[in-house]
């Protein structure tokens, strides 16, 4: 499938902005290991489920859950995952970050469940499974596509990241929403 042209309005238009919070859950383990693009997976709530599948952009902030102890859980592929609930994050990681989010079926991987995966456009020293992720979705980049190669998928994800970062950092009508999470 050919990537459609991305047309971004001058400011968020209905149904955006969408402001919500969700716990970070374990996903399939592909974002970091296979693609080199880590994601924070979240359950799909009714608000997100009402959106068309595709790629979205906005702002997010991680909130540690301090009343939870570390625990190990098993991912569907059998790998053990440490849920530290974000309690190991440093102060400089607990700020507002730009994000790009995929909602859909990931046809390249033939998922049987719809997934919401958020790539936070920052580097982190540790994982933060179990933390709460507060985020604001401000717009839509493109529909979900299928790919014939992993390289084509990665290339499109990197394009989504570049487009989203440019919008969030350079368009005042989008940049101003960062303050809602500070």
Swiss-Prot record:
InterPro entries: Riboflavin_kinase (IPR023468), Riboflavin_kinase_bac/euk (IPR015865), Riboflavin_kinase_dom_sf (IPR023465). Its EC number is 2.7.1.26. The keyword Hydrolase does not apply. Disulfide bonds: none annotated. One of its GO terms (molecular function) is riboflavin kinase activity. The keyword Nucleotide-binding applies. GO terms for biological process: FMN biosynthetic process; riboflavin biosynthetic process. It holds the Pfam family Flavokinase. Zinc or magnesium. Pathway: Cofactor biosynthesis; FMN biosynthesis; FMN from riboflavin (ATP route): step 1/1. Mg(2+) binds at residues 39, 41. The active site is at 117 (nucleophile). GO terms for cellular component: mitochondrion. Keywords: ATP-binding, Flavoprotein, FMN, Kinase, Magnesium, Metal-binding, Nucleotide-binding, Transferase, Zinc. Catalyzes the phosphorylation of riboflavin (vitamin B2) to form flavin mononucleotide (FMN) coenzyme. PANTHER family: RIBOFLAVIN KINASE (PTHR22749:SF6), RIBOFLAVIN KINASE/FMN ADENYLYLTRANSFERASE (PTHR22749). This is Riboflavin kinase. It comes from Lodderomyces elongisporus (strain ATCC 11503 / CBS 2605 / JCM 1781 / NBRC 1676 / NRRL YB-4239).
């Amino acid at each position: 499938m050919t990537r459609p042209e991305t047309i971004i309005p001058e400011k968020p238009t209905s149904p955006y902005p969408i402001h919500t919070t969700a716990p970070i859950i374990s996903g399939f383990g592909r974002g970091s290991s296979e693609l080199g693009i880590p994601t924070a997976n979240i359950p799909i709530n009714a608000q997100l489920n009402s959106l068309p599948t595709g790629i979205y952009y906005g702002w997010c902030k991680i909130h540690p859950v301090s009343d939870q102890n570390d625990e190990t859980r098993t991912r569907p592929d059998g790998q053990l995952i440490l849920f530290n609930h974000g309690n190991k994050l440093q102060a400089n990681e607990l700020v507002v970050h730009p994000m790009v989010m995929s909602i859909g079926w990931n046809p390249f991987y033939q998922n049987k469940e719809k997934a919401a995966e958020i790539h936070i456009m920052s580097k982190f020293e540790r994982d933060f499974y179990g933390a709460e992720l507060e985020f604001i979705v401000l717009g839509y980049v493109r529909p979900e596509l299928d790919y014939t190669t992993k390289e084509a998928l990665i290339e499109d994800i990197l394009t989504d990241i570049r487009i989203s970062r440019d919008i969030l950092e350079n368009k005042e009508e989008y940049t101003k929403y960062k303050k809602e999470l500070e």
